[in-house]
């Protein structure tokens, strides 16, 4: 049996639908937020990655959105609550960093929730400026040069 692998997730595929459900459960539902049609339509131009603990069990996801030819924004990083604290998020981020570098990007930017900021600092992301409010909670703009 195949265990613990990361793969690209094609937009509008069954795996993408599963990724959306996981992102909603971890990131949106606790804040009472829904996805808009416009937000989901924009995702067709983004790059999605999934961490599967088995061939049919998605436990972590993240999305990368090109800002320009040099910068890509990491978004919607989510790991199922029952699978957190096992290195899945770190593996996803490292995979995305390798992907970004191979794709020719020179820098990754992200908006980290207050609670996630130490996680990104451990992965050598740096804070830019002061904290700000996004979707009703404190965030930090962060970046990493590849």
Question: Each PLM stretch: what is its role?
Answer:
Residues 2-123, 128-145:
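Anionic, Ser/Thr-rich low-complexity intrinsically disordered regions
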